[in-house]
């Protein structure tokens, strides 16, 4: 009787286990049918049930020989539910246990799709490339298109064009157009571009065409922008975006034309985010050319206006605050304010680091060296100048000799003594006090703490 009872329990457990595996497979097939029929919500529910059934089987029968297959079903279901962060490692682990070639192809396609969703486009292209010869016609055709698309997105334009050869997918002309432009085959790209423009197609991947082609022939792409902004269906935001990106590309070749393009972008869609970014870009160009306190004042006025403009708010506020600090420090140094050397050095650092204005930073560092040569921070300014532009400090060896006793010069030779820490602590405390004062916050003096010289940006001769 007892033996019979044990046998019955074992048999019942085996049935439950077998039913779990069977149901996971049945639900997988149901999910696939629902997807083919376009019942996406129902399919997603089936995939979720696959995960539940698979988890149950794995938890109750971890040593079963069927577990690898169930893990594969679970991994694929996770991918179909777009839980790609979990699906990718699960698929990579489970694919070797896929029951047949069709399952391997389906799982590999899902792996590629998830890699693309996670932004690993190069790996996605490689995975799609493994299933472009799949037996299932629907999967094969989609894999071939996605393979071309992933190659194009990863910048492998020549490979994308090779992969697209002899394919007839209606989505491919847009991919070819971008790939041809990116490969520098502009005349061939223009054949497809002309067709899309003639049909006033604003859904074509124009941003990608302009970006890829702009790296090869910025003038040809600039001429294309003129045609695109004339499309009847182009929205103000589209026009501003195309003009903005064109202006930024042109700045490297023709700053006058680039600035004119940015002005067009600002006017094309005044209330749009790209227009705000264009106005900010123009202000940043003026900021980069600033050399005096008066120059900064004019740009700060523009930046203050941009604080409330979409597309410019955060950066405009940061730049306005930094430029104001630089201007105030430069003016106070000119007026002979106490500790003007520290203020001038910090202003130069702000111009260099926060404003990305190396020319203005160089002017301020040199002012410190020339106007206050006895400052303990003059040697640090010399090193910063040399770091910015070695050719611009022809007297660098003589200056190093003049400041041979400076802790900063000693640090160049690896001699970090207490004098350097004291100077750096003093500079950091002054920076904190000045920053709090500009915000209206009182700062209580604190005892100096030992500070490693690397806590501020290191300055070393090149």
Where are these regions (language model features)?
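Bacterial N-terminal signal peptides that target proteins for export
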Residues: 1-5
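Acidic, polar-rich low-complexity tracts and alpha-helical solenoid repeat scaffolds
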Residues: 9-462
């Amino acid at each position: 009787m007892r033996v019979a009872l044990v046998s019955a329990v074992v048999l019942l457990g085996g049935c439950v286990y077998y039913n779990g595996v069977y149901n996971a497979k049945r639900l997988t097939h149901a999910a696939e049918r629902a997807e083919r029929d376009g019942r996406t919500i129902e399919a997603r529910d089936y995939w979720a049930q696959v995960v539940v059934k698979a988890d149950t089987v794995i938890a109750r029968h971890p040593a079963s020989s069927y577990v690898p297959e169930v893990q594969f079903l679970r991994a694929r279901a996770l991918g179909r539910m777009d839980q790609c962060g979990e699906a990718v490692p699960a698929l990579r682990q489970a694919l070797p246990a896929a029951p047949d070639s069709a399952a391997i192809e389906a799982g590999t396609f899902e792996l590629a799709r998830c890699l693309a969703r996670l932004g690993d486009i190069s790996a996605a292209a490689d995975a799609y490339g493994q299933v472009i010869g799949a037996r299932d016609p629907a999967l094969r055709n989609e894999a071939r298109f996605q393979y071309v698309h992933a190659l194009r997105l990863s910048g492998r334009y020549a490979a994308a064009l090779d992969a697209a050869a002899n394919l007839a997918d209606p989505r491919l002309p847009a991919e070819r157009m971008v790939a041809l432009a990116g490969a520098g085959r502009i005349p061939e790209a223009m054949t497809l571009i002309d067709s899309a423009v003639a049909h006033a197609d604003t859904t074509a991947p124009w941003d990608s065409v302009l970006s890829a082609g702009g790296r090869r022939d910025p003038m040809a792409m600039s001429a294309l922008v003129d045609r695109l902004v004339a499309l009847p269906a182009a929205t103000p935001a589209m026009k501003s975006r195309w003009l903005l990106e064109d202006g930024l590309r042109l700045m490297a070749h023709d700053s006058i034309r680039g600035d004119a393009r940015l002005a067009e972008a600002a006017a094309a869609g005044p209330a749009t985010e790209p227009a705000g970014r264009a106005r900010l870009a123009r202000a940043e160009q003026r900021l980069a050319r600033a050399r005096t306190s008066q120059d900064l004042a004019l740009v700060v006025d523009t930046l203050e206006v941009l604080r409330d403009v979409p597309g410019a708010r955060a950066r405009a506020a940061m730049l306005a605050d930094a430029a104001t600090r630089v201007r105030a420090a430069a003016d106070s140094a000119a007026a002979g304010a106490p500790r003007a050397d520290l203020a001038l050095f910090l202003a130069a650092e702000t111009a260099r680091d926060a404003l990305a204005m190396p020319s203005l930073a160089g002017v301020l560092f040199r002012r410190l060296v020339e106007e206050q040569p006895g400052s303990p921070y003059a040697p640090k300014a010399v090193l910063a100048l040399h770091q910015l532009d070695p050719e611009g400090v022809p007297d660098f060896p003589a200056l190093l000799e003049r400041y041979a006793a400076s802790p900063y010069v000693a640090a160049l030779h690896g001699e970090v003594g207490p004098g350097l820490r004291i100077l750096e602590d003093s500079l950091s405390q002054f920076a904190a006090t000045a920053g709090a004062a500009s915000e209206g916050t009182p700062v209580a003096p604190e005892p100096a703490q030992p500070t490693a010289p690397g806590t501020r940006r290191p300055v070393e001769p090149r």
